[in-house]
Amino acid sequence: MEGPTHPKPSKDKTFSWDLMILVGVLLRLDVGMANPSPHQIYNVTWTITNLVTGTKANATSMLGTLTDAFPTMYFDLCDIIGNTWNPSDQEPFPGYGCDHPMRRWQQRNTPFYVCPGHANRKQCGGPQDGFCAVWGCETTGETYWRPTSSWDYITVKKGVTQGIYQCSGGGWCGPCYDKAVHSSITGASEGGRCNPLILQFTQKGRQTSWDGPKSWGLRLYRSGYDPIALFSVSRQVMTITPPQAMGPNLVLPDQKPPSRQSQIESRVTPHHSQGNGGTPGITLVNASIAPLSTPVTPASPKRIGTGNRLINLVQGTYLALNVTNPNKTKDCWLCLVSRPPYYEGIAVLGNYSNQTNPPPSCLSDPQHKLTISEVSGQGLCIGTVPKTHQALCKKTQKGHKGTHYLAAPSGTYWACNTGLIPCISMAVLNWTSDFCVLIELWPRVTYHQPEYVYTHFDKTVRLRREPISLTVALMLGGLTVGGIAAGVGTGTKALLETAQFRQLQMAMHTDIQALEESISALEKSLTSLSEVVL
C-alpha cells in the first residue's frame, strides 16, 4: 500500500536510547478541540406545543445527525386549539371549534393560513394577531392562493383522514366522534381527531439554528373573524449514551501501571508457526473476544489504566502480525513510538453498507473529534476531494442522493476532514464540502530486527548500521478488507485470524475512547476555568 503521506512529510522513526520505550508510552492522536463531527448521531426529539395551553400536540424522536434529523410531523388542528375556539369565547354558532363532533366536521373543509412569529416583522403584529395582522405575512397553509415562502422554516398542509361524518343509511359515524365518549359510533377516533395536519421542514429550516423554540400563528380563512391558534416547534438533542465520569480526576485518565494479572492470563491463544518458541518481551493480555459487528463496551464503569491500554496495543499488534506473518515474529522488537503521530491511517478499498437508518456501528462506536495526521496509500474516497488529497483516492464516489448512512466495513473508519468517524451521513456530505477516505487505523508500532536493541548494550566502539524501522501498518495494511476476507496464505482459518485482529481492534477502541473522555473533560475544565478568570 504505497502512496504519498498527507499532510505531513515522513519523519525518521529511529529514536535515541533515552526516548526508546517498549511499552510505557502514552498513545495519543492529534486532537481537534473544535465542535463534534457533523456526522455525530444523536437522539433528536421534535415537539409541537400549543402555546395557549402548554400541551404537546406532537413529540417525534429519531436517530440522526443535526443535518438530516428532520422528520415529517403529524398532528391534529384541535391539538393546537384546545378550548380557545369554543362558542362562549367567539360567537354562538361559529361553524368551527373542537368541542363538538359537528364543529370538528365543519372545520375540516375550512381553509387556513400560517404566519411565522420568529421573523419579528412589525407589520405582522404579535401573538394577539396570530402574527398575521396584514395580508402578505402568511408563508404556508391551505387556501386558494396557496401561500408560500422562500425563507420560512416549515410548511403546514392538510392531511387525509379516512371516514365521513354521515354514513350510508342516514346514520351518524366517522372519526370526528370521540370513541371515549361515543364508543358505539362506527369509525370514532381517539379524541375525535379528524382535522389532521402535516408539518414538514423546508431547506431553510434544515439549515437554521434550533437552539430555542420558534413560534407560528394559524388562522382559519372564513367570513368575519379569522380565529387564531398559536403553536411552537422546538428541538431537543441528546447523546445516545451520556458520557460518564471515570475516576476522581475528570481531566486526566487513570494513569495506572499494568496490572500483573493482565500480563499473565489470556483468553486468546496466539498462533505460532511450527518451531516458534515465542517472542521476547511479548506477553498476552486478558481480553474477551466479541464479533466485529458487535460494539465494544467496557464491562464496568472503571476504565483500565494507561499502562494496560498500552500493553494491550502492543500485544494486539503482535497477535495480528503473528497470525498473518509468523516468520516475522520469531525474533523481533515491537515498539510504541514516543512522539507523534501515534496512530496512522492506511487508505483501503472496501464495500461499505448503505442504509436508510443509522446502523448499530453509528450509534455505539465513538464519534471521534479526532484528526489523523498521517494517511497513506490509496483507497476509496467519498465526496468532493480537493486536489491536495486526491492522491489518496484510487476510487472516488460523489455519494448518494437523499438521507443515507454509509457504514464503514468492520475494522475500518472514515477519515473525514471533520474528524474520524465509523459512519457517514450523506445529508451532511451533500450539503457541505466534507469529504472522507476509507482507512484502516493502526497504532504507531514500529517493527525492528533483534539487533536493534542489542546494539544499545554493545559498548564496543564500531560503526553501526542505521537500523531499518518499519511500521506495522505498512506490514499489515489491507488486512481488514483483503487479508481476513480472502485469507492471507498462512494456512490458518479466517476465524482464527479474525479473533487475533479483534483483540487489536478492542485495544485501539479502548484507548481512543479513553482519550475522547479525557478531551471532553478537559474541554469542560477549560470552560470552567475561563468563567472563573472572567
Swiss-Prot record:
This is Envelope glycoprotein. The keyword Hydrolase does not apply. The surface protein (SU) attaches the virus to the host cell by binding to its receptor. This interaction triggers the refolding of the transmembrane protein (TM) and is thought to activate its fusogenic potential by unmasking its fusion peptide. Fusion occurs at the host cell plasma membrane. Pfam families: TLV_coat. It comes from Feline sarcoma virus (strain Snyder-Theilen). The record marks R465, E466 as: Cleavage. Glycans are attached at N43, N58, N286, N322, N327, N351, N354, N430. The mature envelope protein (Env) consists of a trimer of SU-TM heterodimers attached by noncovalent interactions or by a labile interchain disulfide bond.
